[in-house]
């Protein structure tokens, strides 16, 4: 069994166990008030990242790594990106089937992100959302990062939306902090960091504020930046 296959099984088991432990309403945007501002903050960070690179919705070709049901590509549709230029890959076949049903105008493939089939320099933007946190194997993480760089056009951008903190008391998460990003993406040689944008707060704090003190959510993010757990790191591929 390959490392990628082991990771796929681990991710599937995690989400199944997570759903069993937390319940179906845990991340329900409509019915769980804990979720709203966490989602809003994450989306603000993505939109801010796209603005910072002056992304062109009419022309930009985008690849989403670990796309799941396609949720990370949906905001791009709202921003006017061309559906035919939006691509997503995921190793979980059932997630790809859902994405294809929900967004029939987009391109989805069930493939391993450590061995992408796209030619070199295909995409203007390559993004990921929360996949490296669960990718604890350093070799696999390096392979995926190198594939992301390979398929990005020279001077194109990589948007890394991930959690900079792990979960205390468990080894199933590996924080995507700046040290790890520099190691995986060869910052300084293959890529350069252009921006780091704050997103959602660490879940216990963010969920509490979203439900009980929503007016304080973004104030807490600004005044207490160490409480920001999710960030978007904008990398530019060197020529």
Range-by-range predicted roles:
Residues 156-162:
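Conserved beta-strand signature within the Rossmann-like core of class I S-adenosyl-L-methionine
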Residues 127:
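A conserved beta-strand element that flanks and buttresses the S-adenosyl-L-methionine
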Residues 174-189:
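Short alpha-helix
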Residues 2-56:
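Conserved class I S-adenosyl-L-methionine
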Residues 142-154:
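A short glycine-rich, Lys/Arg-flanked "PGG" loop and its adjoining helix->strand segment in the class I
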Residues 130-134:
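Short catalytic micro-motifs in class I SAM-dependent methyltransferases
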Residues 195-239:
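A C-terminal cap/extension of S-adenosyl-L-methionine-dependent methyltransferases
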Residues 63, 69-115:
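Class I SAM-dependent methyltransferase SAM/SAH-binding core
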């Amino acid at each position: 069994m390959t490392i990628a296959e082991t990771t796929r099984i681990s991710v599937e088991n995690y989400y199944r166990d997570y759903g069993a432990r937390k319940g179906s309403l845990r991340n329900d945007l409509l019915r769980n008030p804990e979720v709203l501002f966490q989602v809003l903050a994450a989306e603000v960070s993505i939109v801010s990242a796209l603005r910072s690179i002056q992304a062109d919705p009419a022309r930009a070709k985008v690849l989403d790594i670990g796309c799941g049901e396609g949720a990370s590509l949906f905001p791009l549709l709202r921003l006017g990106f061309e559906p035919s230029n939006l691509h997503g890959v995921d190793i979980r076949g059932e997630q790809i089937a859902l994405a294809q049903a929900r967004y029939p105008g987009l391109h989805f493939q069930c493939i391993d992100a450590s061995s992408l089939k796209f030619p070199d320099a295909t995409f203007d933007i390559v993004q990921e959302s929360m996949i490296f946190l669960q990718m604890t194997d350093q070799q696999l993480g390096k392979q995926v990062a190198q594939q992301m760089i390979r398929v990005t056009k020279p001077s194109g951008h990589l948007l890394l939306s991930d959690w900079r903190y792990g979960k205390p008391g468990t080894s199933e998460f590996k924080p995507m902090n700046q040290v790890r990003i520099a190691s995986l993406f060869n910052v300084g040689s293959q890529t350069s960091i252009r921006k780091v944008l704050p997103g959602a707060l660490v879940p216990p704090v963010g969920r509490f504020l979203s439900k009980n003190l929503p007016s304080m959510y973004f104030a807490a993010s600004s005044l207490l930046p160490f409480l920001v757990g999710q960030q978007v790191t904008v990398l530019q591929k060197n020529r």
